[in-house]
Amino acid sequence: MAYIEFRGICKSYDGVNQVLKNINLDVEKGELVTLLGPSGCGKSTLLRSLAGLEDISSGQIILDGEDITNTPVQKRGIGMVFQQYSLFQNMNVEDNIAFGLKIAKMDKNEIDKKVKAAIEMVDLTGKEKSYPSQLSGGQQQRVAIARAIVMEPKVLLLDEPLSAIDAKLRRELQEKIKRVQKELKITTIFVTHDQDEAMIMSDKIHLMNQGIIEQSGKPVQLYTHPVSKFAAEFIGHYNILTPVELTAFFPEKRYPGNYYVIRPETFMLSKEPIEDPAYLTFDAKVVDFISRGNVLRYTLQCKDVVFTSEVLFRSFALFEPGATVHVGIEEHNLLRLND
């Protein structure tokens, strides 16, 4: 039995348009699971339904073997961190973190011990007496996380907590959250629209689209084997091609179905003809390229088909716009979608 079970979850605000459409998913104890998807797909609504902040129209939510569908928010044992830090501006770091423990009338010595441990865990030692206005956005979010984990919740819910933080700090906080989650072995559900963030953070990803679960699996599974055009477009920079477009590469072959995807990094580019029989080969013209640090992304054209390829930077293997290159791909990297 899973630690968290969503069973047939439906949600409609007007009785007609469903925000959640018969959601069924499991979360194992100790996992960090991400609900990933574009704005309006239902991911935050599903998260809030687990917290008790949203009523569901039908279905059942089970936590640790107990049906909590109608359990009041305060009795669910769930901690939640939002995009907005929601800190008490008139309280310092220590008091913000201790607030819930004081409400629970915990012994002062125990409160001090737990708050100290939480501060150390989120690397805020030395900031105990600082007020929110004296902290950076990243530090304020760490206070919010510490305030949630100090209560030792059964589940930690994170609703796009890093979206308002700049890229460098976001990466640091991603690493901190993942470290804290693993140390505490706390079951965590993370909501984001950022596929890179989901790939970095997650043990498992549930990709949502218009109120349904489009695809579930480990990050590498979603990246290497998207099941639909939506999944391929949302998860990675795939080349999405029709069977007709594929025949521009390989005129002698015929491909059934509607769509195929090719990951940019699976193409081999060469100045010399590719003799390896494991590769299907064709020629293409370089349209343009951009540098992304140690990765070069080439825009290439074969007949009327434009596609992209990514290769590690090597100064001796640069291809200038206008050049003709030999392209190879192993056939198992042509992935047929279910669409």
Where are each of the predicted segments found?
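Short coil-to-beta microelement around the adenine-binding A-loop and adjacent beta1/P-loop entry
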Residues: 16-18
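Non-catalytic connector elements of ABC transporters
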Residues: 248-339
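ABC ATPase nucleotide-binding domains
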Residues: 32, 73-227
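ABC ATPase nucleotide-binding domain
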Residues: 5, 26, 62, 326-328
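The feature captures the beta-strand-to-loop junction immediately N-terminal to the Walker
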Residues: 36-38
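Conserved ABC transporter NBD signature motif
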Residues: 59-67
